[in-house]
Amino acid sequence: MRNAKIVCTLGPASDDAETIRSLADAGMSVARLNASHGSTDHRRTVIDRVRDVDDELTEPLAVMVHLKGPEVRTAEIDEPVMLETGSEVVFAKGDTSTPEFVGLTVSITECEPGDTILLDDGRIEAHVRRVDGEEVVAEIISGGKLQSRKGVNIPGVDLDIELITEGDERELELAADKQADFVAASFVRDGEDVYKIIDKLEEFGDADIPVIAKIERAGAVENLDSIISAADGVMVARGDLGVECPLEDVPVVQKRIIKKCVDAGVPVITATEMLDSMIHSRRPTRAEASDVANAVLDGTDAVMLSGETAIGDHPVRVVETMADIVNGVEETDEYAESVEQRVPSAKDQSRTEALARSARYLARDIGASAVVAASESGYTARKTAKFRPQVPIVATTPNERVRRQLGLVWGVIPRSLEYQESVEHILEGSVQAALDANAAESGDTVVAISGLVSNIDQAQTTNMLKVHVAAEQIASGKQIVGGRVAGPLVRLTDGDLSDVPEGAILSLSTAFDGEFTGDIEKIGGIVDAREGMTGYPAVIARELGIPMLSGAIVPDRIAEGQTLSIDAERGVVFEGNVLRTPRR
């Protein structure tokens, strides 16, 4: 069970149904669709494929539509163009490029003499000499071959470009129509840009899609607090940051962004060239493995693969490798120590955060196996994850979209659960989900936390924190004698107690109509299939003061000798010993 999740970019190498399923089996939690490539109609088809795969899985598989944004690229050309070092080149809006003229998708006349123009992730560098009307004249400082449609960065220059392009509007309409789980916004400058995306989604009828803000400009780093406050998540685009900012600053900026996001309880994705060599190689470099490991140690919610899975030679192997690296790091003492030392504070006057933080330390102090969160909207689960408990967070929700969205959140195992009857029933179902997910074993202690639940009669229980024993309920009945006891099951047919072990739980069928012979002191508890409070077994139970239920049938699948627990006050029988000391 990994804490850090994996986001995979789908492309020509991976967007068929079979490969999507294989990627999910290998560890993909979120499928990213990059609108910078391909068509909107094709993305519509791929979303349907992802949904079909999600329907087949226990673990959630979410869809992220990543907007192209107001990017600046060079013109589309058939053959590379050589830009010679020392030559003078004109940059202007246009659809062609030559050694003397570089066509761009937008005008960059906001430049001033002395500004730097970087092409193709900084591989080609030019310095602006002058601006003549709509043309920017620059000297090539570091030349090279310019390929088709390469990115253009101008550090420190705020170009007058609309945040949401016509193409972005089509993608946002698609996201709303197909109920995408996330929208990632490129070139976000501040919190206001995030709100513009949300407003546009609302126009298209779905303002509930979480917006992930991609941090890729120096200005965005300066406005990080407002972006984190406005966004539902953050993506650290190290590649673009490495062009916009001094290269030596990027590792520290990455750590700063991750820490701020964790402190705010906002999911953060670490992206760009994490296993880039595996686009063609079957093994990553040692530096790449260290890069992934350090992001995990920093506390990132997710690590992202781009070209490695979109156009790589073996996308599934890349995901398997990423999962192996993450798992390896998370199993170390260094990782556990790092998590323990970085627990953020709860916000002032936030009841949910105070309870979530308490759940984290309560789970640690009592040796709980999991934190179980009943989280209809996902809010309580996300807040619980903020405090990074050292055990899995099993979050249940009746909302399938929320289930998929929680697949991006650190340490959360999301499960579907229909909410009905009462908060207590919801918690019981959530604990059972933890058992089914192998996050806890029968008899383990778990910490249960619940947020406000709508459409429930007892919804006044807005936030609740309790210690709970995780066990599979196998029978229920009416209390005859109270108490709690655990012992080996004995199915008694004739009343003979001579071979009954000490502390046995007697299961009596509806056909039992005799009396006990032998040492009745050996009986630990009684589960009687017959209704009634005055029969012979009830008399014995009262005489001995041992727990007893009536009208409770132990299923045939439970073998003799297997340990059962009776909780007579609650009227239930559990499989296993729920009274034992919790494991640590």
Q: What are these language model-derived features?
A:
Residues 1-8, 58-64, 147-161, 201-216, ...:
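Short beta-strand/loop segments at the ligand-binding rim of alpha/beta enzyme cores
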Residues 2-15, 68-70, 76, 92, ...:
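Active-site mouth loops of central-metabolism enzymes
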Residues 46-54, 309-332, 463-466:
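C-terminal helical cap(s) of enzyme catalytic domains, especially alpha/beta-barrels
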Residues 9, 23, 34, 66, ...:
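Conserved, mostly hydrophobic/aromatic
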Residues 72-165, 169, 439-445, 449-495, ...:
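Acidic, glycine-rich flexible loop/linker segments
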Residues 293, 380-382, 389-420, 524-526, ...:
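Nucleotide-binding motor/catalytic cores of P-loop/tubulin-like NTPases across gene-expression machines
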Residues 4-10, 31-33, 63-65, 183-185, ...:
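Hydrophobic faces of well-ordered beta-strands that scaffold small-molecule active sites
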